[in-house]
Amino acid sequence: MSFEVLEKLEAKIQTAVDTIALLQMEVDELKEDKAKLETEANELRAQREQLEQKAQQTQQEHAQWQERIRALLGKMEDVE
């Protein structure tokens, strides 16, 4: 092989190495982004579960208050 061909081959190899390095950095960034998104998704799931539990608790309390009010109204009707 001539010296020119070797220089061209070296340039192509260097370009490939540079491209691989850039792609690896991009992959690393994407992995970090993915990890952050997974953490955020898990936090949001936990918050949603807490809100669902709170909503259920509030509904139960509401039902209990309605029952108490009905009982009081029934007693008031009995008094009249």
Curated annotation (Swiss-Prot):
Pfam families: ZapB (PF06005). It comes from the Bacteria. GO terms for cellular component: cytoplasm. It is found in: Cytoplasm. Keywords: Cell cycle, Cell division, Coiled coil, Cytoplasm, Septation. Its main location: cytoplasm. Residues 3-80 form a coiled coil. GO terms for biological process: division septum assembly; FtsZ-dependent cytokinesis. The keyword Disulfide bond does not apply. Gene3D superfamilies: 1.20.5.340. Belongs to the ZapB family. Homodimer. The ends of the coiled-coil dimer bind to each other, forming polymers. Interacts with FtsZ. Non-essential, abundant cell division factor that is required for proper Z-ring formation. It is recruited early to the divisome by direct interaction with FtsZ, stimulating Z-ring assembly and thereby promoting cell division earlier in the cell cycle. Its recruitment to the Z-ring requires functional FtsA or ZipA. This is Cell division protein ZapB. It comes from Vibrio vulnificus (strain YJ016). The gene is zapB.
